[in-house]
Amino acid sequence: MRQGRSATPTLLIVDAQSVKNADTAGFKGYDAGKKVSGIKRHIAVDTQGLPHAIAVTTAEVTDRKGALLALQRCKPALCKVQALLCDSGYVGKPFAQGVKDILGEHVSVQIAKRSELHTFKVMPQRWVVERSFAWLEKNRRLWKNCERLLNTSLQFIHLAFLALLLKRF
């Protein structure tokens, strides 16, 4: 690619974002942890912040299940991935085993932990996925979920990242 990197990443950074529903939204779920009624966007990005796996679910779906769904949907394009960097919402052997079942036994799951719970601290490499979510928020249509179908919301996320890529390159 233009930046001198391989098109297939070896490290993916995984995270989920809860988004509130508008009145017109068709699917509704409740994320009890963040107290949001709406949907969740699950993305896995490379070190440049470019998405390689995306899934949209109702908000009650756990981060772990949503990430596995995103990885399963994009499995053929993720053949060279060696490691996943996740936050503490992805802790657990079932998630790590699910990643190994989807991507292969060679893939390791690394959990980035905060040293102190009640202080804000930027975690190394985790900010990349947060920046990708911020890029999505620049699109007015993605501020809230107003789509009747989850697939429509997913396609608008793809369009937003495509527009970003076209501007960037």
Predicted segments — roles?
Residues 31-34:
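Short Gly/Pro-enriched turn/cap motifs at secondary-structure boundaries
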Residues 38-42:
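Short glycine-rich loop/turn motifs
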Residues 15, 43, 49, 67, ...:
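Mobile genetic element proteins and their domesticated derivatives, centered on retroelements
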Residues 156-169:
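Charged phosphate-binding loop/patch that engages nucleotide di/tri-phosphates or the phosphate backbone
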Residues 55-76:
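Active-site beta-loop-alpha junctions of metal-dependent nucleic acid enzymes
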Residues 60, 79-153:
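Helix-centered, glycine/charged polyanion-binding patches within enzymatic domains
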Residues 1-28, 45-46:
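Active-site- or DNA-interface-adjacent structural scaffold in DNA-acting proteins
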